[in-house]
């Protein structure tokens, strides 16, 4: 089980300052998770950590600064760099984002041993290509091994789309081998037998352009997830097949204008939005990629954030969830009280300052329902992080 986060800043600071309790043969891996805003980076970070310490919401730019999560398992330490979504200066200005939000993903890449590129396949608008910002990031650091993670595959009704997406997002090349989609009609697509990744001659793309596809499980290490198509009575069995490709040996900066995908991914993983099973497969893979080296953190550390930062972020997550449009972005949070109660419970009082009376009414809600719900849900999340009772009181006032 992951350790709880300390409730006092002093205790957390002490843990962060502590010399790591190095095992005999320590191994370490620093992982940058990058992707478009709202791709699910923080959700994945939380799943890998086994405890929710990063804020998550449906709105973009929930993560405002880079924070580190720490997974310590036996002699291995994974350091997860949870970063804001990669965006451009124009969009940053529109969302009133600080300059650090443009800089942080790039800074994370500088310190990473491996990069996970997360793509939300349920988003029709963004799933067919990697954003220019992501491609720019990858081409700037071609020496860092990268892995493609397709997220929310369970929300995709037509599974054959995954094959097209994989081909587009990898430019048809994974781990130096050319991917090919091979289709054969079969009467029973519900078969659970695993089909290995095979090396075969690539067929011309025009031949298979109009054939129906349906994805069966390919090599487990390559995909990290199986997909069930038992609903099709007569479906096509399709395998991703790899052959040696004359792909670029060194992926340096290049003309990104016409690129939609990245031909230097080492692996592909497919994850369901809320299921832990595939995340465990990914976690095992990451633990195997760790290299000998000293731990950065004591094994009692779960995150580099202070308890107050975690609290602010979790309350902010709820504001983003329950307030419309731009309203949550204008709320200023001020912690009035943070202390231990007589029975060891954590007592928190936070002021939420808003610029307009209309915003105040929305935040309080009819009969105080909205603010009560925010306090209740945020309080529960904080209990799960700190593993102690939390009494959270939220007050709403106008900015003076």
Language-model regions, residue ranges each:
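Conserved nucleotide-binding/hydrolysis micro-motifs of P-loop NTPases
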Residues: 60-62, 84-87, 121-125, 152-157, ...
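P-loop NTP-binding site
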Residues: 299-400
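Short, structured loop/turn "capping" segments at alpha-beta junctions
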Residues: 176-181, 292-298, 325-331
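Conserved GTPase G-domain signal focused on the G5
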Residues: 40-41, 155-165, 188, 192, ...
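Signal for well-folded cores of large energy- and translation-related assemblies
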Residues: 49, 53, 68, 72, ...
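Conserved G1/Walker A P-loop phosphate-binding module
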Residues: 1-119, 351-353, 397-398
């Amino acid at each position: 089980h992951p350790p709880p986060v300390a409730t006092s800043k002093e205790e957390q600071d002490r843990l962060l300052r502590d010399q790591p309790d190095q095992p005999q043969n320590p191994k370490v891996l620093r992982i940058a998770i990058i992707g478009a805003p709202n791709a699910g980076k923080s959700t994945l970070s939380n799943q890998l950590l086994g405890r929710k310490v990063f804020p998550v919401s449906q709105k973009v730019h929930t993560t405002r600064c880079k924070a580190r999560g720490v997974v310590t398992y036996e002699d291995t330490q994974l350091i997860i760099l949870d970063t804001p979504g990669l965006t451009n200066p124009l969009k940053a200005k529109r969302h009133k984002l600080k300059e650090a939000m443009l800089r942080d993903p790039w800074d994370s890449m500088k310190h990473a041993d491996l990069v996970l590129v997360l793509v939300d396949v349920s988003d029709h608008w963004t799933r067919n290509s990697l954003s220019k910002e992501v491609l720019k990031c990858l081409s700037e650091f071609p020496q860092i091994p990268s892995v493609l993670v397709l997220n929310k595959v369970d929300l995709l009704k037509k599974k054959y789309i995954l094959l097209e997406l994989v081909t587009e997002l990898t430019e048809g090349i994974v781990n130096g081998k050319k991917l090919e989609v091979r289709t054969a009609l079969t009467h029973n697509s519900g078969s659970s037998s695993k089909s290995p990744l095979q090396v075969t001659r690539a067929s011309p793309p025009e031949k298979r352009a109009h054939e129906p596809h349906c994805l069966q499980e390919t090599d487990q290490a390559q995909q990290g997830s199986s997909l069930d198509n038992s609903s099709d009575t007569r479906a096509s069995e399709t395998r991703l097949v790899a052959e040696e490709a004359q792909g670029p040996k060194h992926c340096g900066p290049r003309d990104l204008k016409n690129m939609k995908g990245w031909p230097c991914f080492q692996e592909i993983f497919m994850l369901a939005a809320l299921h832990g099973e595939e995340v465990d497969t990914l976690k095992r893979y990451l633990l195997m990629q760790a290299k000998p080296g000293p731990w950065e953190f004591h094994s009692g550390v779960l995150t580099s954030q202070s308890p107050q930062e975690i609290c602010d972020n979790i309350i902010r997550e709820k504001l983003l969830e329950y307030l419309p449009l731009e309203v949550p972005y204008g709320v200023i949070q001020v912690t009035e009280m943070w202390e231990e109660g007589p029975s060891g419970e954590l007592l928190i009082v936070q002021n939420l300052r808003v610029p307009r009376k209309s915003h105040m009414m929305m935040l309080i809600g009819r009969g105080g329902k909205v603010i009560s719900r925010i306090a209740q849900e945020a309080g529960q999340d904080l209990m799960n992080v700190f593993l102690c009772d939390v009494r959270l009181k939220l007050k709403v006032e106008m900015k003076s």
